[in-house]
Swiss-Prot record:
Cofactor binding: number and manner: Binds 1 zinc ion per subunit.
Matching PROSITE patterns: AA_TRNA_LIGASE_II (PS50862), TGS (PS51880)
InterPro entries: aa-tRNA-synt_IIb, aa-tRNA-synth_II, aa-tRNA-synth_II/BPL/LPL, Anticodon-bd, Anticodon-bd_dom_sf, Beta-grasp_dom_sf, TGS, TGS-like
Gene: thrS
Residues of the signal peptide: none
Region named Catalytic: 242-533
GO terms of molecular function: ATP binding; metal ion binding; threonine-tRNA ligase activity; tRNA binding
GO cellular component, one term: cytosol
One Gene Ontology term from the biological process aspect of the record: threonyl-tRNA aminoacylation
Family classification: Belongs to the class-II aminoacyl-tRNA synthetase family.
Protein name, per record: Threonine--tRNA ligase
Annotated residues for binding of Zn(2+): 333, 384, 510
Role played: Catalyzes the attachment of threonine to tRNA(Thr) in a two-step reaction: L-threonine is first activated by ATP to form Thr-AMP and then transferred to the acceptor end of tRNA(Thr). Also edits incorrectly charged L-seryl-tRNA(Thr).
Length: 640
């Protein structure tokens, strides 16, 4: 009979097969009350599952990460229960857990409305109040088919067909409602009280737009009301920081139906874009990169030779001219190899670092487009380093330092790094992979950084390091990458002459710091809520007169600011100064300069910040020095 070993080493003996819940009850009623599931011999199981042999056991509660995932998964089933009660004609599809929540895909003859979502949420609450047990039954395959046939659940039957090897399946009963799942699930609906449905969207069966359209109901669930309230507050803050909303309010950009996934940059937004480009241009020049420019449209044969046509064709925009097929480039790497291939290269020439602000286009699904964060036309701060195997380590180490310095300039101090290593299917010999992986790991260690290993997650052509930023809301954005490539130089005949006067292929390092300009600007907008640091602000100063008699002097101040490289405007409207200050504050302009008769007479300006802090009266030269100092500090400078 089983001996159960607990995480603290204590052991409990039983003279009969025992369930996870029974073990919890033997430890104490408080633990049993909070038991969601168990981890038996490192495998998650339901609280009702029996343990028949000597085993290790961890009791899973809502405080555990796995417990929270189980709560969310069970909430998805609860959506199904409520939907079938309110809309019997609905056909249930799948309801998985996602980051911080869950969704359920449902076939309906007509779309759900927001009122429908509210009604579903209300019904879920009533079902939770009934405090019923969730019953698990392992059911033979034939009986599972009969259950879903009798209920007319055709999508569930299709899912059963996808699992021909399964002889028995777990059915979970929420009263009269039944769903199919590997589990585990909560033992009782009392664990599901802290949830909220968040939105409705469209989806397709199996994610294929050629298939029938489904309705997707999203929700979130947490261990308690406090966690739920904190999440809702964070989401509300994220909505207030939505780059699309701020982009419109600050006249930065717009999108329109005639060019889906393409950005119409307005003057203010384009100013931010240009600041980024000029900054990255200088950074790359200072670090030994040569800036190049390659064609937008390239004969399709190059993409066939590079391998992109075989693996990426559906995401490429193509065109035809004079009996030739072309593709609008979705990435820059094959073109950079063409530049490298011009002229004979020696080992003495390496490393060669080629950088391009490459404009790329990818035919992303329309449903995935999101403001300037997910677009079809974008520009990358793209570069490729051609080097010898022995140079990988130094190039990666230099890139890591450069990348972290750039992120600090934009105000991002917390950066996560992940090293992805060889997958099972790969090109290149093991010795080359050993060298590359060690070079990347050593570079991370030498920088004194914490990093996460992702075994088997590298591309088939080489290992990589990914850099992810954490913003002010704790959200993580993957931006930078450096990727070893042993494949493309071979496919595109890149070579150099070695010290032994032989031909060899260089290693190609794909690298980007910002990723795409469009997405990075979106991240900046949301991180700063539009209150950009002075160096990134489209307008750094607005000069305002109190009466018409100061208009000429105000224009002279603006002219001097511009002569000194500041981005400045004037507001000479015949409005009260308080009104003008309020309006320009809403535009998030860092500095507001006011001129009255006294300032004109003394040759000074009265300076206040967009947060309302009065910096007092100072000379124009002193103000110029103040702004230049703020700009020099970049993202480290906070306008009070």
């Amino acid at each position: 009979m089983p001996i159960i070993t607990l995480p603290n080493g204590d052991q409990k003996s039983f003279d009969h097969p025992v369930s996870v819940m029974e073990v919890a009850q033997s430890i104490g009623p408080g633990l049993a009350k909070n038991t969601v599931a168990g981890r038996v011999n490192d495998r998650l199981v339901d609280a009702c599952d029996l343990i028949t042999e000597d085993s290790t056991l961890q009791i899973i509660t809502p405080k555990d990460e796995e417990g929270l995932e189980i709560i969310r998964h069970s909430c998805a089933h609860l959506v199904g229960h409520a939907v079938k009660q309110l809309f019997p004609e609905a056909k249930m599809v799948i309801g998985p857990v996602i980051e911080e929540g869950f969704y359920y895909d449902i076939w309906m003859p007509c779309p759900f409305t927001l009122d429908d979502m509210a009604a579903i949420e209300e019904r879920m609450k009533k079902l939770i109040d009934q405090d019923y047990d969730v019953i698990k039954k392992m059911t033979p395959r034939d009986e599972v088919i009969k259950v879903f046939t009798d209920r007319g659940e055709e999508y569930k039957l299709r899912l059963v067909e996808d699992m021909p090897e399964e002889k028995a399946m777990g059915l979970y009963y929420h009263q009269e409602y039944v769903d199919m799942c590997r589990g585990p699930h909560v033992p009782n609906t009392k664990f599901l009280k802290s949830f909220k449905l968040t939105k409705i969207s469209g989806a397709y069966w199996r994610g294929d737009a050629k298939n029938e359209q489904l309705q997707r109901i999203y929700g979130t669930a947490w261990a308690d009301k406090k966690q739920l309230a904190a999440y809702i507050k964070r989401i509300e803050e994220a909505e207030n920081r939505d780059h699309r909303k701020i982009g419109k309010a600050l006249d930065l950009f717009h999108m329109q139906e005639e060019a889906p996934g393409m950005v119409f940059w307005h003057a203010n937004g384009w100013t931010i874009y240009q600041v980024l480009e000029q900054y990255m241009r200088k950074v790359q020049q200072d670090n030994g990169y040569q800036e190049i420019k390659t064609p937008q449209i390239v004969d399709f044969t190059l993409w066939e030779k590079s391998g992109h046509a075989a693996n990426y064709a559906e995401n490429m925009f193509t065109t035809h001219s004079e009996s030739r097929n072309y593709a609008v480039k979705p990435m820059n790497c094959p073109c950079h190899v063409q530049v490298f291939n011009q002229g004979l290269k020696s080992y003495r020439d390496l490393p060669i670092r080629l950088a391009e602000f490459g404009s790329c286009h990818r035919n992303e699904p329309s449903g995935s487009l999101h403001g300037i964060m997910r677009v079809r036309g974008f520009t990358q701060d793209d570069a490729h380093i051609f080097c010898t195997k022995e140079q990988i380590g130094k190039e990666v180490a230099d890139f890591i330092k450069l990348t972290l310095d750039v992120y600090k300039d934009f105000g991002f101090e917390e950066v996560q790094m992940k090293l992805s290593t060889r997958p099972e299917k790969r090109v290149g010999d093991d010795a080359l992979w050993d060298l590359a992986e060690k070079s990347l790991a050593d570079a991370l260690d030498a920088a004194g950084l914490e990093w996460e290993l992702q075994p088997g997650e590298g591309a088939f052509y080489g290992p990589k390091i990914e850099f992810s930023l954490k913003d002010c809301l704790g959200r993580v954005w993957q931006c930078g990458t450096i990727q070893c490539d042993f494949n493309l130089p071979v496919r595109l005949d890149a070579s150099y002459v070695t010290e032994e006067n032989e031909r060899d292929q260089p290693v190609m390092l794909h690298r980007a710091i910002l990723g795409s300009f469009e997405r990075f600007i979106g991240i900046l907008i949301e991180h700063y809520a539009g209150f950009m640091p002075p160096w990134l602000s489209p307008v750094q100063a607005c000069v305002m007169n109190i009466t018409d008699s100061q208009a000429e002097a105000s224009e002279q101040v603006v002219a001097k600011l511009k002569e000194n490289g500041l981005r400045a405007i004037s507001d000479l409207r015949n409005e009260k100064i308080g009104f003008k200050i309020r309006e320009r504050t809403l535009e998030r302009i860092p500095y507001l300069l006011v001129l009255g008769d006294r300032e004109v007479e003394e040759g000074t300006v009265n300076v206040r910040t967009r947060s309302g802090k009065n910096l007092g009266t100072m000379s124009v030269d002193a103000f110029i020095d103040l702004v230049k100092s703020a700009v020099a500090e970049r993202g480290r400078y906070i306008v009070e």
